[in-house]
Amino acid sequence: MFRKLSVEFLGTFWLVLGGCGSAVLAAAFPEVGIGLLGVSFAFGLTVLTMAYAVGGISGGHFNPAVSVGLAVAGRMPPASLVGYILAQVTGAIAAAAVLYVIASGKADFQLGGFAANGYGEHSPGGYSLTAALVTEVVMTAFFLLIILGSTHSRVPVGFAPIAIGLGLTLIHLVSIPVTNTSVNPARSTGQALFVGDWAISQLWLFWVAPLIGAVIAGIVWKIVGDDS
């Protein structure tokens, strides 16, 4: 179990450092920067690369919602959930801390949103609480369905990380304007702790909505999937 939790920590660390790091450090540099498209691909690439690197050890969850969804679908023992989630959250916080140290080394650094997730006035596009809730539930549910389907025994071995990484890229392309894209409570927690204030007060949604989406996906997969 120690090896599994260690790589969940490392995988989540890489997801936050690579994904949020691209948003904080490179999205607008130089001038236009990598923009929404680049940030979306960065998040997808972090999952793709670490799924290949360490997915064979822990399953490559890197996300509390993924762990919960897999448990509901019967793909992992519920007793492992607490350990996985703690490893993921601590990995995200550690990555946010490293990113803060790097970003604050720039003379004109301003904390701003620090890639935190938000709704209302803190939504990149000014979307409401309801829009944010629906977006996070639906996007997380489909992310889990992609994971559950692509890792099924019927699917050729070795292709799942590609489908999952591209799926996460697509999710970011759609939902960055709405919530800055969470679908991952650990990722949201790390950034919120450094932003504080509004990011902390809105953090509940980025736990509740992804977990609801994950549970829905797990139940749907038990109905339409074929894990027997």
From Swiss-Prot:
Motif (NPA 1): 63-65
Membrane topology, as annotated: Multi-pass membrane protein
Pfam families assigned to the protein according to its UniProt record, in alphabetical order: MIP
Principal subcellular localization: membrane
InterPro entries, alphabetized: Aquaporin-like, Aquaporin_transptr, Aquaporin_Z, MIP, MIP_CS
PROSITE patterns cross-referenced by the UniProt entry: MIP (PS00221)
Single Gene Ontology MF annotation: water channel activity
Motif window: NPA 2: 184-186
Domain notes: Aquaporins contain two tandem repeats each containing three membrane-spanning domains and a pore-forming loop with the signature motif Asn-Pro-Ala (NPA).
The protein's name: Aquaporin Z 1
